[in-house]
Amino acid sequence: MTRLLTLGFFLFLCLLCYPNIITVRNIEELNNANKNAKAGDTIILQNGEWKNVTISLDCIGSKEKQVVIKAQTPGKVLITGNSKLKIGGLYIIVDGLYFTNGYAGKDAVITFRSDNKHLANDCRVTNTVINDFNNPKRMDENNWVTFYGKNNELDHCSFIDKKNMGVLLAVILDDERSRENFHSIDHNYFGRRLPLASNGGEIIRVGLSQHCQFNSNTRINNNFFEDCDGEAEIISIKSCANEVKGNVFKECQGSVVLRHGDNNIVMNNYFLGNDKIGSGGVRVINKGQQVSNNIFYKCRGADFRSPLVIMNGVPNSPPTRYVQVTNAEIVDNIFYECSPISLCEGRDAERTLPPDNVNFFNNVFYNTHDSIIYNVYDDIKGIHFTSNKVSDKISQPLTDGFTKTILPKQNNFSKKDTIRKTGSSVNNIPIAEKEVYASSGTNWFKKYSTSSSKKRISINCLTADEIYKQLEINDEVIIQLTGKEYKINKPFIISKTVQFKSDKKNSIKFETENILSLFILSGKGNLFLNSINIDGKNVKATHFISSDSNGYSDHYNLTINNCSFQNFNYKNGCQNIFYAFKYMIADSITINSNSFINNNCNFFFMNEEKEDKGYYNSEKVFIGHNNFNSQRGTLLNIYRGGSDESTLGPNLTFSHNKLSNCNGTDPLIILTGVQVSNIFSNNFSSCNPSSTLIFYKDLVRAKHNFERNTLTNSGKIEKNGFVTEVVNTIK
């Protein structure tokens, strides 16, 4: 009997110690399983939709026996609605979740703490996807991932389409519990991030300016970044002793920026610009930075986005401004068919300290397209150039430390006689890109693709009611306007791809009530107006077309092609042909080959972002090959206020337009803070003859080209030092 009791007690102890596998079906069961979990347990989330859930984990595992919380099938546990994941325990692994069709509000989607007192340590999130999981409104800021604690890892995850304000991934160093953290961010796929039209669109930020003197020791290794165009900084380092190694940056309009903090390493990375405008590399600020053994391939960024930027500093700078670059090493890098690097960048009335004690050696510049390899904006005597090789085709006189030589043509990656460096080579690009791409992200979620699989239908619409019906279905639609007059009692809401067209033989009359807009471009709206003669005499809507005033995070596009607009009049109620409300962003606005005749209203207004924080309403604006005749009102007003230097836009092209007898009480074209404008090959005749034709205003560096225009009996150009005039004719 004693033996039986002993054996039973022993078996009972074994059962207590043996790890459990628990399947949970809802958040209540998960909370209970988390509460009772012990080291080595596995909690399986049943496949299906988990909507409006806060998953909070504070269980305790061990180094040998982690607590695993995993999807029954990776990608089949859908976290939707207002949902988030909080991890505040020890040795926890989360595996296989899919965040989609939802948002997290002010919180991060994934946070490595359950509350302020319970931080994650030695925890891991893997094989997980966050896809387009944005707050509905663009200005409602949050992160997708925030790191706290120490020794946490994020690996083999995929992140695509963050659109609202806020850094995608932030490493927080707000107290000692999260400093010298040795976090690992590795083998992840960071996919498309569209231009945010604001600061704060980074993919990864390590630290904040107020914590920049602390060591973070975060490792960002072997990740794949693709089309990360949110702002000038893809990775923003604002702390000390971090490393960025073995990553691929493919066609990203930005750079790895060592913004604050010292002794960071950027090594063995591939920056594959592939001739994309704005594709950058590395920007260096502060002390003791190392940039070595990187490949910069066809990176075509300029200024702050140059392939390599060494900044000027501010005298007696606080750590939170621009500390002088000192004791840096720029070594063993290859620049292949890149735009010029930038030395002493940012030189202005404040940033007057050039770099000092910078070792710049054994770098290779292969270039057959450009005449120069670097721009210099201040004294470079503090940069020590040694053993750098440059293609002999470069015509720029070079300082000592650069040798022009015959470098072999890089047209065959398999050749053995091409440029080589120890550990990195242009030859390795296809191999490295393929390997890092294949090993990044999840294996169950398709990486970002530009192709569209949505069905598109074409239908004739005789009345407004028929149009409303087509706008309510999910399919993309081509609406053929077969009627002559459309009576509108509510706006056409465009939240998908919609094309309106006609045969252009007869005028189309839109008759509206006193509504806000006839067309409202909502999130994901792509509106095409094609070959329509529009009579606006009976349009009482304040705006013929506008963006949605709710400021959604999803972008929109507008294209007007081969249309005519006539008889729009503010006296009838229509103030603007197009009006952009605050906070929403268009990827592109294209106005091509149209006629605007006898209208008495404003045309294209994008001037609501008056907070002067660098916000604006459209990344690219193209107005070309149009005829403007007998117009009353401002033609174009674009506003981007403030002194922020982190964006590429707005970018305006205004070309091959003919303007006759166009007048307004304000300038016809008003450009405030536009980063790039090209106004060329236009003909202005009797346009604002006694006033201002075009007005430029800029607080930060901009590039304005005014070229090959003809001005006859037209107003003056109020320009600044950023405007370049070439071959214009003024009569």
Regions found by a protein language model. Give the residues of each.
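Surface beta-loop-beta hairpin patches that serve as ligand-binding interfaces in beta-rich domains
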Residues: 398-460, 474, 712-731
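Flexible, charged surface loops at secondary-structure boundaries
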Residues: 35-39, 61-63, 87-88, 147, ...
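Short coil/turn segments at beta-strand junctions that form active-site/ligand-binding loops
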Residues: 39-41, 65, 278, 356, ...
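Bacterial Sec-dependent N-terminal signal peptides
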Residues: 1-21
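Right-handed parallel beta-helix/beta-spiral solenoid domain characteristic of secreted/periplasmic
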Residues: 21-25, 47-53, 57-109, 132-134, ...
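Glycine- and acidic/polar-rich repeat regions and solenoidal domains
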Residues: 51-54, 81-86, 100-121, 131-409, ...
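Acidic Gly/Asp/Thr-rich repetitive segments characteristic of extracellular carbohydrate-active
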Residues: 20-52, 56, 447-488, 493
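Short, conserved loop/helix-junction motifs that constitute active-site signature segments
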Residues: 58-63, 353, 494, 699-700
